[in-house]
Amino acid sequence: MPQNVVLPGPAPWGFRLSGGIDFNQPLVITRITPGSKAAAANLCPGDVILAIDGFGTESMTHADAQDRIKAAGHQLCLKIDRAEARLWSPQVTEDGKAHPFKINLESEPQEFKPIGAAHNRRAQPFVAAANIDDKRQVVSASYNSPIGLYSTSNIQDALHGQLRGLIPSSPQNEPTASVPPESDVYRMLHDNRNEPTQPRQSGSFRVLQELVNDGADDRPAGTRSVRAPVTKVHGGAGGTQKMPFCDKCGSGIVGAVVKARDKYRHPECFVCADCNLNLKQKGYFFVEGELYCETHARARMRPPEGYDTVTLYPKA
């Protein structure tokens, strides 16, 4: 619904506009600076400006609206239109009639239950369940106060009950088949038990003992077979690169190197043989094995008198 808003001057006002007749859109506030005068006047993004200082905005361009706002001095009067906020509700069709579904937004009161209020509201005897397996019996006690649950006796009883379920029962409870002493099986077991037995040995020790016994007659006592150590021949470092030597000064080159016709030189030695001009970033020429610049190379390659220099191009 339309409403009037007055912002006290002077500028800045603290909001940003968009739209206008040149954009075929109404003038709309798109941004509000927090803590500004527009925020204090409760302006919101999305508000449509209908008039500025009494002038309607339906025929204003974006630039005209900005000029009208800048012209405001001690105060700025805006007439805005703000859309009403509506709560969405689903449409329910019942017997061919569409009506909105009723929604109750009231909170339901809940009963306040402090901690411990639900423990033993009604006194009941604590009776152990019948037919409990003896192997899985766990002793636990319950009282009105949980302090007694952590006593030493209760902890020991609970631990004992849990261990009884984990540890298997003793073999003495199981019935064993009795063998009469006059039977042949009893005498055989009794004789084998009385005979002296040799100490048990592991499989690897028995194999080692057999190897020692088999070779005892072939070799003298106190000797053993030992393989001669084999020296591994390591090949030379084929991947290592030899240090290049400078073609001019003859010393080794470490670092940057200049290569020309399979010859290496220091960057400072890559100069003309006549004028010592550095040829690193220039053209160079080899004449009779020496390195020259273009000027001295042409001087050394002049044809004899009576001959002319002719440029030959390779055939296509």
Curated annotation (Swiss-Prot):
Enumerate the spans annotated as LIM zinc-binding domain: 244-303
User: Which cell locations does it reside in?
Assistant: Cytoplasm, Myofibril, Sarcomere, Z line
* Domain (PDZ): residue spans on this chain: 1-84
| InterPro entries tied to this protein | PDLI1-4/Zasp-like_mid, PDZ, PDZ-LIM_domain, PDZ_sf, Zasp-like_motif, Znf_LIM
Disulfide bond as UniProt keyword: no
Q: How does it assemble?
A: Interacts with ACTN2. Forms a heterodimer with PDLIM4 (via LIM domain).
What name does UniProt use for this protein?
Answer: PDZ and LIM domain protein 3
Q: Which organism is it from?
A: Bos taurus
Q: What does this protein do?
A: May play a role in the organization of actin filament arrays within muscle cells.
One GO biological process this protein is involved in is:
muscle structure development
One cellular component term from this protein's GO annotations in UniProt: Z disc
Query: Iron: is it a keyword of this entry?
Result: no
Identify the taxonomic lineage of the organism of origin: Eukaryota, Metazoa, Chordata, Craniata, Vertebrata
The UniProt GO MF terms for this protein read: actin binding; metal ion binding; muscle alpha-actinin binding
- Using the record's annotations, give every residue carrying the modification Phosphoserine: 18
Q: Where Omega-N-methylarginine occurs, residue numbers?
A: 164
Q: Which UniProt keywords apply?
A: Cytoplasm, LIM domain, Metal-binding, Methylation, Phosphoprotein, Zinc
